[in-house]
Amino acid sequence: MARLKEIYKKEIAPKLLKDLELKNPMEIPRITKITLNMGVGEALADKKVLENAVSDLEKIAGQKAVVTRARKSIAGFKVREGWPIGCKVTLRSDRMYEFLDRLISISIPRIRDFRGISPKQFDGRGNFSMGVSEQIIFPEIDYDKIDKLRGLDICISTTARNNDEGRALLKAFNFPFKG
């Protein structure tokens, strides 16, 4: 079992039950999935760029990435429906907790000029999204072997009912919020 999963079950869940004044243990907020998304607009001109992005995302997640395709044509961006424009990975269960552990303890501290994550990045329903401007903050990526610095989106989906519950959950996991 992943280290953070054990910590959640033994320490975080009972603490949240008491702090949020919940009556039923099934109401305790938990993380359901983590989605990593990398939009690769340059893939329209060069297919090799998308292959490199997919391999980077697979190294970061430890799981196979899925190529995302354009849902509709947009003439302004010179995109046709069905063209590959990015890649994504959805992590659940043990892999999700292992990724979250690496993100909190290793990757986030490696962000340049890092002063804490803004607590305003919640969506109103307890889900948290953040952008990472460089994939080299992850230890799995070798700086000498990448072709270009690319950013990615990290979305953490929770069962929290509002932003306060979601923030309390992530703060219990030692997420480095500002203030």
UniProtKB/Swiss-Prot annotation:
Organism superkingdom: Bacteria
Keywords for the protein's UniProt record, in alphabetical order: Ribonucleoprotein, Ribosomal protein, RNA-binding, rRNA-binding, tRNA-binding
Q: Which GO terms describe its biological process?
A: translation
What Pfam families does its record include?
Answer: Ribosomal_L5, Ribosomal_L5_C
Named from the GO MF annotations, one term is: rRNA binding
Q: Which GO terms describe its cellular component?
A: ribonucleoprotein complex; ribosome
NCBIfam families in the record, alphabetically?
A: PRK00010.1
HAMAP family, from UniProt?
Answer: Ribosomal_uL5_B (MF_01333_B)
Record's function text: This is one of the proteins that bind and probably mediate the attachment of the 5S RNA into the large ribosomal subunit, where it forms part of the central protuberance. In the 70S ribosome it contacts protein S13 of the 30S subunit (bridge B1b), connecting the 2 subunits; this bridge is implicated in subunit movement. Contacts the P site tRNA; the 5S rRNA and some of its associated proteins might help stabilize positioning of ribosome-bound tRNAs.
Family, similarity comment:
Belongs to the universal ribosomal protein uL5 family.
What is the official name of this protein in its record?
Large ribosomal subunit protein uL5
Q: Which organism is it from?
A: Saccharophagus degradans (strain 2-40 / ATCC 43961 / DSM 17024)
Tell me the name of the encoding gene. rplE
